């Protein structure tokens, strides 16, 4: 078993506390293999974390940068270029929910949408050019095995040579077997009127508040994963358009 720890971002007031805990509480022979670093927007954030790790008992911990903001995605090529010689990381994770909130996107695109895959295609193309592996964003429909495998086949068709790892949120789906003769998804353009966008935002707000696990957690409603990011984005959209 290999375990990775997601810490708070380097701009968070909890960042140092997280690192101190890892340094003092996790032994060198731990099953913890690496650290997920959220909201990476510059290579310096990775270098700083690498330096801190070098002072740990477990100095071999891997770093997995998480691309979750508009600036992070814009700087992805620069970040990858900067690591050409240093080799401080092998994997890059894309966080779709955080990215949509950061970029002011509404509605949040899903694997059914062309807009969702346009972002994934760009990231995978850059990772392929730099020989890095991809950690996929959580699949938002945890009960839809068919759509999950259609999405996987679509990814494999796009970039058959890129190593792709899947979110632990979807571990149950990843252990299933696809249906016979199931093909790749055929994503379509998301075209909604302002009225439809408002209606969707109202639905997300209502479903999130009625179904969340606790005050700081996500919700699952009608087989759909609703993170707090989506609720916040829906509220922001309604404040501007209603």
Predicted segments with their positions:
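Expand to "…catalyze enediolate/carbanion chemistry for C-C bond making/breaking, isomerization
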Residues: 1-242
């Amino acid at each position: 078993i290999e375990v990775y720890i997601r810490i708070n971002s380097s701009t968070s007031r909890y960042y140092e506390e997280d690192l101190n805990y890892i340094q003092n509480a996790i032994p060198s022979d731990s099953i913890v293999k690496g650290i997920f670093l959220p909201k990476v927007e510059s290579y310096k954030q990775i270098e700083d974390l690498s330096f801190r790790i070098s002072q740990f008992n477990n100095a071999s911990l891997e770093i997995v940068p998480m691309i979750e903001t508009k600036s992070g995605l814009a700087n992805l090529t620069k970040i990858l270029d900067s690591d050409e010689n240093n080799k401080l990381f092998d994997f890059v994770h894309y966080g779709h929910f955080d990215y949509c909130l950061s970029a002011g996107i509404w509605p949040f695109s899903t694997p059914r949408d062309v807009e969702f895959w346009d972002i994934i295609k760009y990231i995978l193309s850059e990772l392929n050019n730099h020989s890095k592996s991809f950690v996929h964003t959580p699949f938002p429909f945890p009960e839809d095995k068919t759509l999950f495998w259609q999405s996987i086949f679509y990814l494999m068709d796009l970039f058959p040579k890129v190593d792709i790892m899947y979110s632990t949120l979807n571990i149950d789906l990843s252990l299933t077997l696809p249906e016979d003769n199931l093909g790749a998804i055929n994503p379509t353009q998301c075209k909604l009127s302002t009225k439809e966008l408002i209606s969707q935002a109202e639905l997300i707000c209502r479903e999130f508040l009625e179904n969340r696990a606790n005050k700081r957690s996500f919700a699952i409603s009608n087989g759909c994963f609703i993170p707090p990011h989506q609720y916040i984005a829906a509220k922001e959209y309604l404040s501007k358009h209603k």
